[in-house]
């Protein structure tokens, strides 16, 4: 029999794709294959499935055109003019010392060995940012050799700067520091790994004012942050005001060395407004997202956490100490309470989130309420919390075979607006409401269904108590809804965001939870060519 050369075998297929998928894009081809695919913008994380890893363009330069005014290369020379690719500079420090407002310094790929910290002291202006960016298609690696404490330090007052497209490695303390009084700084397309913290904003003791002032108007986006010993992206002592964290993957912090209570994925002790959106925060030793833990006066305004996937963090998932809005988040696999809010005086909105299958992994979990709002602390025995809960799914929280499932705790200071939620965690205690008088504070699933909860609280209109019918449960968790889910088309129209956790537009009758169920409106056929290796 004649043998077929598989390395030359090509199959020409027609790939049938539901047109609804085109809004999300398809994954990248496997190395070694020649595949014609539709790909998302490099600034969009995917895929949508819970167990798959999202594709972030960690060190790829921004997709906008880059006009380089200067060049740096590992084999360059700081004595050269740096204005051509054939006569580049050699070091980040020289580039930082020399660049002027409006300059774009392009770094060629390769490893830049640091023997000491690089200090950025020059500022751009409102119309002329100083940009340090990877040369298109290449990845410059800033390497501390395991001995340099910090790699990049934006000195006090350094502002109007962009840093884009770098990998930071082998530092011992912080990969990047913004010391204080830094404003209008853009950090994007970074891959930062290791140290005590990957990126640190402000300097000083935890409970004290910052040594060099706050930082403000900072954007961190389209980056991967991982493997630090303590909190990966850390604003302590703060404040960090007017912050945007967007399309960032944060993982594996606090897993080695001393961990847990100082090892959150994203931790901002003080400051607002803060926007955290479209991030994937997973597998960290402490909390996933922890905001405003030192804003003890409460009433933090402009705090928005939306369209994030917060997965398998060993303590809490999302923690809003002093107020904010949670919208369209997927929260599963935490080791402790999935959501903890309202430690201080707060106004909180929790809208269209899916919070399920938390406290199931016995290797790091401990049993607690799945959602906690207004828990009594020494500072405020019952903090006053104005809380809105609408269109959320709370289901299957805490392993029923290991201590039993758990529900929601609402403290005595909670002023509640609650309707159009689905509860399916603990049949004999879905809600513990300490603010209720005249009866036991624990409400069963049946009491939500039969109107007892509504009679005592005036809340609970259109709540559901049926199994939500996710695509799959533990351990292969996928919290998308099946077509027959009771959550489909049963959300509050007035309160639902315009889109869902994946940016898909919600229809005229929105679903409960973070994911809007959808079906293809048409099918198209795309040619697919595969070469076997």
Language-model features, listed with the residues they occupy:
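Surface beta-loop-beta hairpin patches that serve as ligand-binding interfaces in beta-rich domains
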Residues: 52-56, 60, 98, 442-458, ...
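Surface-exposed loop/turn segments connecting beta-strands in extracellular beta-rich domains
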Residues: 114-115, 140, 170-172, 185, ...
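Predominantly extracellular beta-rich ligand-binding scaffolds that present long acidic/polar faces
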Residues: 115-116, 120-121, 127, 307-312, ...
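Feature marks extracellular polysaccharide-active and adherence modules
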Residues: 108, 133-135, 155, 164, ...
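Extracellular beta-strand/beta-solenoid scaffold signature
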Residues: 115-120, 144-153, 170-179, 194-215, ...
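Acidic Gly/Asp/Thr-rich repetitive segments characteristic of extracellular carbohydrate-active
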Residues: 54-56, 74-114, 118-119, 511
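Intrinsically disordered, low-complexity Ser/Thr/Pro-rich tracts
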Residues: 1-68, 80, 91-94, 98-101, ...
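Right-handed parallel beta-helix/beta-spiral solenoid domain characteristic of secreted/periplasmic
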Residues: 109, 123-174, 222, 464-468
């Amino acid at each position: 029999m004649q043998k077929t050369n598989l390395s030359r075998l090509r199959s020409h297929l027609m790939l049938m794709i539901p047109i609804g998928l085109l809004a999300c894009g398809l994954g990248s081809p496997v190395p070694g294959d020649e595949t014609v695919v539709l790909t998302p913008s490099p600034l969009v994380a995917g895929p949508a499935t819970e167990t798959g890893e999202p594709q972030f363009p960690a060190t790829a330069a921004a997709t906008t055109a880059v006009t380089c005014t200067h060049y740096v290369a590992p084999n360059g020379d700081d004595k050269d003019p740096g204005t051509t690719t054939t006569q580049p500079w050699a070091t980040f420090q020289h580039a930082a010392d020399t660049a002027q407002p409006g300059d774009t310094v392009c770094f060629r790929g390769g490893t830049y060995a640091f023997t000491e910290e690089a200090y950025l002291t020059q500022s751009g202006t409102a119309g002329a940012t100083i940009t340090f960016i990877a040369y298109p298609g290449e990845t410059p690696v800033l390497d501390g050799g395991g001995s340099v404490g910090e790699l990049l330090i934006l000195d006090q007052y350094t502002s109007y700067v962009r840093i884009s497209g770098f990998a930071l490695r082998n530092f011992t303390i912080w990969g990047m520091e913004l010391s204080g009084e830094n404003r209008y700084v853009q950090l994007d397309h970074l891959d930062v790994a290791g140290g005590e913290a990957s990126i640190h904003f402000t300097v000083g003791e935890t409970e004290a004012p910052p040594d060099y002032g706050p930082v403000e108007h900072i954007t961190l986006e389209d980056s991967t942050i991982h493997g630090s010993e303590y909190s990966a992206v850390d604003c302590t002592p703060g404040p960090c005001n007017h912050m945007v964290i967007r399309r960032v993957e944060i993982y594996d912090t606090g897993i080695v060395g001393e961990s847990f209570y100082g090892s959150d994925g994203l931790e901002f002790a003080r400051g607002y407004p803060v926007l955290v959106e479209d991030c994937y925060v997973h597998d960290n030793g402490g909390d996933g997202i922890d905001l405003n833990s030192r804003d003890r006066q409460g009433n933090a305004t402009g705090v928005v956490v939306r369209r994030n996937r917060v997965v398998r963090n060993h303590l809490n998932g999302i923690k809003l100490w002093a107020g904010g809005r949670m919208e369209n988040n997927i929260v599963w696999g935490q080791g402790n309470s999935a959501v903890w809010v309202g430690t201080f005086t707060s106004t909180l909105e929790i809208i269209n989130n899916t919070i399920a299958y938390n406290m199931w992994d016995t290797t790091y979990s401990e049993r607690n309420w799945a959602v906690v709002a207004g828990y009594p602390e020494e500072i405020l025995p019952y903090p006053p919390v104005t809380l809105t809960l609408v269109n959320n799914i709370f289901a299957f929280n805490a392993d029923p075979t290991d201590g039993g499932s758990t529900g929601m705790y609402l403290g005595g200071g909670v002023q509640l607006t609650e309707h159009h939620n689905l509860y399916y965690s603990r049949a004999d205690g879905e809600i513990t409401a300490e603010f209720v008088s005249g009866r036991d504070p624990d409400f069963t699933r049946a009491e939500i269904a039969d109107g007892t909860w509504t009679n005592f609280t005036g809340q609970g209109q259109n709540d559901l108590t049926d199994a939500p019918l996710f695509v799959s449960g533990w351990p292969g968790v996928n919290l998308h809804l099946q077509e027959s889910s009771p959550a489909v088309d049963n959300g509050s129209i007035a309160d639902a965001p315009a889109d869902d956790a994946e940016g898909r537009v919600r229809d005229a009758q929105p679903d409960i939870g973070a994911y809007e169920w959808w079906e293809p409106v048409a099918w198209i056929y795309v040619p697919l060519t595969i070469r076997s290796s």
